[in-house]
Amino acid sequence: MGLSRFHGYSTHTNVPLNQLFFIDEKWLNVAAAIPVNYLTAYFMMVHQAAIREDEWFLIHGIGGGVGIAALQIAQHLGVKIIGTCSGWKHNQIHEMGVEHVIDYRSENFKDRVLEITDGNGADVIIDSLGGKALKDSYGCLAEFGRLISYGFSKAA
């Protein structure tokens, strides 16, 4: 398997040797999907939001594939993390080093984010939920904050 900047939908392409990885044939389908979550998170955070160290970052769906990728990238960048997910995922997310985890089903995440950030709101929010969550995300966005929507699971 290789990584390429272009030709993502091609059946064949040329790739530098240092971007090739041996993958056992029985794992090809799984291996092909691995970069998707991390590249999605990285593109949103670094290229679209230009997230910076010490900014507050709200990750909706922090327990999912893109959410965990965003969490790990944010930790590497020194970003302050707030996440929303189902209550049963809270222990896992806490074990990954996230202090502020909100159960979006039983808590008002907008109020909690404002409380956690001393009323300032999140500097960057990634929202995969859509619907009412998108509206509430705007309500807890810091002045000059950046909100990025992707892969809605509900109609906006």
Indicate residue ranges for each PLM-predicted region.
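Terminal helix/beta-alpha structural elements that buttress the NAD(P)+-binding lobe
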Residues: 1-156
